């Protein structure tokens, strides 16, 4: 088992001969800042470069210092201040050689908020205003028509020969009392109680059956709200629950949410 690396020997070399090493360590402890973090303190650029390139074989000594906190964040930065890697360690844990190699050489996994809804939107209240469009058809930029899947839960696109299969929509306008530049709406399949709802990036939109057209939409129900924007003859629908995502299509595939290309996000309404 390899021990938690001691980088104090390396930090000593970063101070000039005229500087008091022990007083620097005391100052560091009082402020409870990690000595591992190259972004703290007044270390020279050469020290930062040395820290980034440390190998576990060079840092196998035990530390004789006592820390008030049981956890420390280890991070490495480049010379221009960009964080290259970051780890949170516990001094109560033992580490294998593989653990230390991973900390030294591997970048921390990035958490992708691809499907996380915009949480502050749950505080908004959308009140039903009026029916603005009825029994209209939406075609994408490839002139594909939207139709309902056999399972009735999803929408797909293709070039239809039988236009009786194309889906017609009703659009209801809502008011949130918030940003006047946005136009919140719901999309309902005509002659039904099936409403289009968002599920996340690259996920198909889901058809939710509701007993009636909702008069007030709040909280988790904001997946029913889309912001309608019309530019010339192109129409866009941005999700209120996922503000960076649009209702989108691909060639002969399910209608889904996407940021843009390779998906198509503009529609013709007729």
UniProtKB/Swiss-Prot annotation:
Acetylated within its nuclear localization sequence, which impacts subcellular localization. Residues 1-114 form a propeptide. Disruption phenotype: Deletion mice show reduced nociceptive sensitivity compared to control mice in models of inflammatory and nerve injury-induced pain when associated with IL1B deletion. SMART domains: IL1. One of its GO terms (cellular component) is cytoplasm. GO terms for biological process: cellular response to heat; connective tissue replacement involved in inflammatory response wound healing; cytokine-mediated signaling pathway; ectopic germ cell programmed cell death; extrinsic apoptotic signaling pathway in absence of ligand; fever generation; immune response; inflammatory response. GO terms for molecular function: copper ion binding; cytokine activity; interleukin-1 receptor binding. The modification N6-acetyllysine is found at residue 85. Belongs to the IL-1 family. Monomer. Interacts with TMED10; the interaction mediates the translocation from the cytoplasm into the ERGIC (endoplasmic reticulum-Golgi intermediate compartment) and thereby secretion. Interacts with IL1R1. Interacts with S100A13; this interaction is the first step in the export of IL1A, followed by direct translocation of this complex across the plasma membrane. PANTHER family: INTERLEUKIN-1 ALPHA, INTERLEUKIN-1 FAMILY MEMBER. This is Interleukin-1 alpha. It comes from Mus musculus (Mouse). The lineage of its organism: Eukaryota, Metazoa, Chordata, Craniata, Vertebrata.
């Amino acid at each position: 088992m390899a021990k938690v690396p001691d980088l104090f020997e390396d930090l000593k070399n970063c101070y000039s001969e005229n500087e008091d090493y022990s007083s620097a360590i005391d100052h560091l402890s009082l402020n409870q800042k990690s000595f591992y973090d190259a972004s703290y303190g007044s270390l020279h650029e050469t020290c930062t470069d040395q820290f980034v390139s440390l190998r576990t074989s060079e840092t196998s000594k035990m530390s004789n210092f006592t820390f008030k906190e049981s956890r420390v964040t280890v991070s490495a930065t480049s010379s221009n201040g960009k964080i290259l890697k970051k780890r949170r360690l516990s001094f109560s844990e033992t580490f294998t050689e593989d653990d230390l190699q991973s900390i030294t050489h591997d970048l921390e996994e990035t958490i992708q908020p691809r499907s996380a809804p915009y949480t502050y939107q749950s505080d908004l209240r959308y009140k039903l205003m009026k029916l603005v469009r009825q029994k209209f058809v939406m075609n994408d930029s490839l002139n594909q028509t939207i139709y309902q899947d056999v399972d009735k839960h999803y929408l797909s696109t293709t070039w239809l020969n039988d236009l009786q299969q194309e889906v017609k929509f009703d659009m209801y306008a809502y008011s949130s009392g918030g940003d006047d530049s946005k136009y919140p709406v719901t999309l309902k399949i005509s002659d039904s109680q099936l409403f289009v709802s968002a599920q996340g990036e690259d996920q198909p939109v889901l058809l939710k059956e509701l007993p009636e057209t909702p008069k007030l939409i709040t909280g988790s129900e904001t997946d029913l709200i889309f912001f309608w924007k019309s530019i010339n003859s192109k129409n866009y629908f941005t999700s209120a629950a996922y503000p960076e995502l649009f209702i989108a299509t691909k060639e002969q595939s399910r209608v889904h949410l996407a940021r843009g290309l390779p998906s198509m996000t503009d529609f013709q309404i007729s």
